[in-house]
Amino acid sequence: DFSQGSIVGLACYAAAVVSSFSIPLAIVAAVGVGAGIGLLNGVMHAKFKIQSFIVTMCTMFIFRGLVVFFTSNFPAETPYAIYDYDNLVGKFIVVVAIVAAGFIVFRFTKLGRQVRAIGSGEIAAAYSGVNVDRTKILAFVIAGALAGIAAFFALVRTGSATAQTGNLMETNVMIALVLGGLSVSGGARSNYMAVIIGAMMLTCLTNGLVLIGADPITQQLI
């Protein structure tokens, strides 16, 4: 899903706009926008049979353009109280809960088995009784909703939504997968913990470069 970064950017802007009325509703707005874009991606891919990387690459540019347009012409003001939600313990609990829930779903539920089956072979999965289209759409919706949560985290950390919010996040996602040794083509042998390990390695590497004072160009090169 190459549109993850753009989803974060647009969901962050939506949350920023709604936060002036209600911060809890801003969370709902971020998750809702993310899930909605995920639904669009899933339907375009599953129902119209367009390759997922083509669909999500198109939506990546479309929604990034919307983020730039909205933030440039209609900047959103956020209340100072938004920083009260920038709580390390709270965010840690949310992340751990999401990771644990993802592990349980991926390893021990029917949905997880269906996802792995589709990754191994769509035709075989369909013959075994898996509703391929519905499962794919659901996967995109979940990914979009999680991007919405990330968008709210970005908002409470910076207090604003900018044109650069979530920019290049899709690249970081791919790097995390590769660092974790996960096959980007998926399949029955996919290891959920490899995703977590890859994300942690990328975070440690990025933060380490910042701590040693590496300039942005050097960081990007590495």
Annotate each predicted stretch with a short phrase.
Residues M60, R64-G65, V94-V105, A143-A151, ...:
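Hydrophobic core segments of alpha-helical transmembrane domains in multi-pass membrane transport
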